[in-house]
Amino acid sequence: AETFVRLSDEKNIDKITVKDIVEACGISRQAFYYHFQDLLEVIEWSMEQAFGQLLDRSLQEDDPEIVLNDFIAASENAAPFMQKLFRSQKREQVEWLMARCVRSYLQELISAKGKLPRIPYEDLDIALNFCTYGFVGLLLECCDKKKTVDRETMARQMYRLLQGRIGEADPVRA
């Protein structure tokens, strides 16, 4: 996966082949296919690893604003590679993978933190979908190199939104 990211610095993502990866890694095609079915699975594995690491850090933190700030920072750090993926023919699949990873991240975080009141599954499902696509939209915005993001402000705004307090004055700016 790291080799794929490195190769994306040298050539267009749509032009990277399994042959390029196996040559750069010094492994056989058989070894590649033992671990991955195709290049999209490499991207998927890479995203799952990144969100897994983010989840581990998030579970160690008690302050939701810091968790959100870390989430935004991770998005900014991944932005150069994500921009390349979004300009590729794989954009639609990458957006779907991102939504799946974000939803899994949120579900695991909620489950581990146990901070939600008992709500019916259908309500939790719609809340997860709503948050997932809101977060993915913000991630896409963070990946837009033309837009600069104030992480701390965005984290506060997201936290107030999740608490249903978005219309209230920002205590930091007041």
Model-derived segments and spans:
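An amphipathic alpha-helix adjacent to DNA-recognition modules
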Residues: A1-V5, D9, D14-V18, E23-G26, ...
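Amphipathic alpha-helical packing segments from all-alpha helical-bundle domains
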Residues: N69-D70, R91-L116, E122-G137, Q163-G167
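C-terminal peripheral helix-coil segments that are non-catalytic and often amphipathic
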Residues: S111, E141-A174
